[in-house]
Amino acid sequence: MVKSSVSRMLAGNGLFYPIIGFASFIAFLYLSFGDLWVNYSKEINLSFVERNGTQFYVDGKAFYVNGWNSYWLMDHAADYSTRPRIRTMLQASAKMGLTVCRTWAFNDGGYNALQISPGKFDEKVFRALDHVIAEARRNGIRLILSLVNNLQAYGGKTQYVKWAWEEGVALSSSNDSFFYDPSIRRYFKNYVKTVLTRRNIYTGIEYRDDPTIFAWELINEPRCMTDPSGDTLQDWIEEMSTFVKSIDRKHLLTVGLEGFYGPRSPKKSIANPEVWAADLGSDFIRNSILSTVDFASVHVYPDHWFHHKNFEEMLKFAAKWMLSHIEDGDRELKKPVLFTEFGLSNDNEDFEPAQRDRFLKMVLDVIYKSAKRNRSGAGSFFWQFLVERMERFNDEYGIVPWENPSTYRLITDQSCRLAKVQGLLSTQAEHLKNFCAPRN
């Protein structure tokens, strides 16, 4: 009744439609630029993560990572209907005591592409990445940002080769020409420079100056199978890591390896899952030992690598796999080792929910023991965490952690254990003090 009377009054004065039009305009501005009005002045102060030998440090204290993967953050931030998921994920993770998220800072040539074509960027998607970084900062979460995919998902090296081929400058249509084609290398360097020097519209900080970013990752799971000697990929890593460091010397850098030992490694026959692993063109030691690479990365997917082992055999292998790489970090690399992806598929024929928790606990236990002994195993990252109503983004490894009480307990227990070793970080204190105290 009141609403209709007001409407008649405004209409009688000829003001109804102008006001409605103005309101629509304001709504449009909010949908387009609404985050510019969000108060980002209350972010938690973060310091850069540094490395000294085999350990990470923050403000002079050892820093061990209980982290996770949510590769989809930028993509979902680009659509206002899904943008709230970023805050939900980051807030929930902070409450679990998680400290670092690994996510994609790339999307090449597809839907919600950050890089539409070589050197051409979508400002809307860049603002989405700005939003992700600003939200992470507000919640005291650091980010590992990966710069390109070896796989075809979200463009990857396949898209770079396609662009060069379409422009008539490609040397080869092989996906692996990404690593050696001069034109494609220029494409990628331009992309890297654009991202590293981007000024966040919400915080006013260039990415290369923002301690919210834990590290850059050159490429997710690099393989160059057309050159199993490893020389092609090694040359690319040397060139690109040097290029990144020429622009940004404040942040740490890793390659993004799965951890397989190459044909020249004495461990190729005793630590690799199977013979094929030595012929992928990568080599954990050789690729990671470069002075421009600050820490090593390893993935742990025994059920993906083996097809004829039972769960107990895979669990035993995974533990041995982790310890082998921690040994490498201590003795060969003299650098920290992060297990940046680990998971167990729920599509395995003999899968039982309890198996996943046993596998996760094994990984977390190895990291905790390494931290207690000041060894190089510096942290781990679950693959992957989702929020509700994201079923189509699940790849058989994903979980909504707060919907799985036993898994949730494992995550928070690890946060408490690492906090006991390193001391509570200032960003964790509010969330962890209450529920860690009874456990300690």
Question: At which residue positions do the language-model features occur?
Answer:
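N-terminal signal-anchor transmembrane helix specifying type II single-pass membrane topology
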Residues: V2-V38
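Active-site mouth of glycoside hydrolases
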Residues: K3-L10, W37-P336, F342-R358, M362-I367, ...
